[in-house]
Amino acid sequence: MNIYDFDDTIYNGDSGIDFFLYSLKKHKVKIKCILKAIIKYIGKVFGKYEIKDVKDELFDYLKDIKDLDLFVEEFWNKHEKNIKKWYLENQKEDDVLMTASCDIWIYPICKRLNIKHVICTQTDKETKKIIGKNCKGKNKIEIFNKMFPNANVENAYSDSLSDLPMFEISKNAYLVKKDKLIKYEK
């Protein structure tokens, strides 16, 4: 079993930022959402808010999109090309994707790529607000251990040292910089 981060690891860029920018072009994003997100982000810097609070404000406009599933499919029609070739060439059936990105846009691309095991930030279907914790760092591993209690992780891949908990549970770990895989020595 191999475990992968998504953004800047197997996806070239940050899918959340790309999704937001795509939304700005294709859908009316309320300025109010952006301003509230900026305020919450400043509050996060000072320890008043968490990243989930920022995401809740930033993606509040999603509840106004009439056919969100279609909108997400159209987004992936344009952005699927950002999946890195090295991943597609090495993909295995038991891969596990673990990402802080939201299920709203992660599940559809995983379905397209036939990735069956996905751990990501969960959102309420109606309100589009985040349920529980942002899926990052140790939170990823807590969920992973519940889903796969006796897993034997061969390789872990991430672009960030915030994913050290992923590296700690794997035999081999790789830092991903663009298309270059750098063996991480534990």
Predicted ranges, named:
Residues E50-K85:
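Metal-dependent phosphoesterase signature
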Residues F71, W76-K186:
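C-terminal cap/substrate-recognition subdomain and adjoining C-terminal extension
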Residues D7, Y11, K26, F46, ...:
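A general boundary/transition motif marking the beginning of the first structured unit of a protein
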Residues N12-G13, I51, G137:
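Generic structural signal for well-ordered secondary structure
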Residues M1-G47:
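Active-site neighborhood of HAD-like aspartate-dependent phosphohydrolases
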Residues I34-Y61, C110-L113, H117-V118:
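Short, compositionally biased "basic patch" segments
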